[in-house]
């Protein structure tokens, strides 16, 4: 298989619409198959005020688009920087404006998998920008802040948006971030596990500050996408739920 070279990063925006939750309760969201194919091309120029950092000269076999979504302040940018650079953005909170992305190539069972990870703004005024990027996303990491009950209460609204704008077979995972702030916890783990079970989502708690389960979340997504892309008859089917339950610290498998 010939390998491609990672291009420089770009980002952009386009408008779309929103939707309200269904009155008859949650519709299960099945962790599914990402549509195989080449990486999604950027939709426009970089947003002003933030730099887009690419993968430089890294080579890869296949690329997938992954989006980080959730309310503003839940730690999406910090989670991305922890995974990409192994660092923590301490200090003053700076909210993402519009959308930005970074690339990272990971080795999955001998295959070079490039994850093009899009960091989205959580504020309502940027929501239409986010909608435009759902349609060609292969996977979504939906975050809430365990110290912020309102961010958890917004999860069902985010799931409705995902159902409206994303592919039916998008891979979806729920992450409770900032678990390092145990004394400030406002969302019980049991409540998040119940929500994840209702929607059939894999779930784990993470910390961008300590790195808890951060690599695991992205690695699990990469393994799922790679396995669905190759579809080798002799290769056992990758079980996303079982993998994070086995490998994670404090992770759980939540099936309906």
From Swiss-Prot:
It is a lipid-anchor. Its cofactor is Mg(2+). Mg(2+) binds at residues 77, 96, 119. GO terms for molecular function: GMP binding; GTP binding; GTPase activity. Residues 38-48 have a biased composition (Pro residues). GO terms for cellular component: Golgi cisterna; Golgi membrane; plasma membrane; secretory granule membrane; synaptic vesicle membrane; trans-Golgi network. It is an enzyme of class 3 (hydrolase). The keyword Metal-binding applies. Its main location: membrane. GO terms for biological process: exocrine system development; Golgi to plasma membrane protein transport; regulated exocytosis; regulation of exocytosis; regulation protein catabolic process at presynapse; vesicle-mediated transport. It comes from the Eukaryota. A motif (Switch 1) lies at residues 86-101. Keywords: Cell membrane, GTP-binding, Hydrolase, Lipoprotein, Magnesium, Membrane, Metal-binding, Nucleotide-binding, Prenylation, Protein transport, Transport. The small GTPases Rab are key regulators of intracellular membrane trafficking, from the formation of transport vesicles to their fusion with membranes. Rabs cycle between an inactive GDP-bound form and an active GTP-bound form that is able to recruit to membranes different set of downstream effectors directly responsible for vesicle formation, movement, tethering and fusion. RAB26 mediates transport of ADRA2A and ADRA2B from the Golgi to the cell membrane. Plays a role in the maturation of zymogenic granules and in pepsinogen secretion in the stomach. Switch 1, switch 2 and the interswitch regions are characteristic of Rab GTPases and mediate the interactions with Rab downstream effectors. The switch regions undergo conformational changes upon nucleotide binding which drive interaction with specific sets of effector proteins, with most effectors only binding to GTP-bound Rab. NCBIfam families: small_GTP (TIGR00231). PANTHER family: LD44762P. This is Ras-related protein Rab-26. It comes from Bos taurus.
């Amino acid at each position: 298989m010939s390998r491609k070279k990672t291009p420089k990063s770009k980002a952009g925006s386009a408008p779309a619409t929103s939707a309200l939750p269904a009155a008859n309760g949650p519709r299960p969201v099945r962790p599914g198959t990402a549509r195989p194919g080449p990486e999604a091309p950027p939709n426009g120029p970089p947003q002003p005020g933030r730099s887009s950092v690419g993968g430089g000269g890294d080579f890869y076999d296949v690329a997938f688009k992954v989006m980080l979504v959730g309310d503003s302040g839940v730690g999406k940018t910090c989670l991305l920087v922890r995974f990409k650079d192994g660092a923590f953005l301490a200090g003053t909170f700076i909210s993402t404006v519009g959308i930005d992305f970074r690339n990272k190539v990971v080795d999955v069972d001998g295959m070079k998998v490039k994850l093009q990870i899009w960091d989205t703004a959580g504020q309502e005024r940027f929501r239409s920008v986010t909608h435009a990027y759902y349609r060609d996303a292969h996977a979504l990491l939906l975050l809430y802040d365990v110290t912020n009950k309102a961010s958890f209460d917004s999860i069902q609204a985010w799931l409705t948006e995902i159902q409206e704008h994303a592919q039916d077979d998008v891979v979806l995972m729920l992450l409770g971030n900032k678990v390092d702030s145990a004394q400030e916890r406002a969302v019980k783990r049991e409540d998040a596990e119940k929500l994840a079970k209702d929607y059939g989502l894999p779930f784990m708690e993470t910390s961008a500050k300590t790195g808890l389960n951060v690599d695991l979340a992205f690695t699990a997504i990469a393994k799922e996408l790679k396995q669905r892309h190759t579809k080798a008859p002799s290769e056992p089917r990758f079980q996303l739920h079982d993998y994070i339950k086995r490998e994670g610290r404090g992770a759980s498998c939540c099936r309906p």
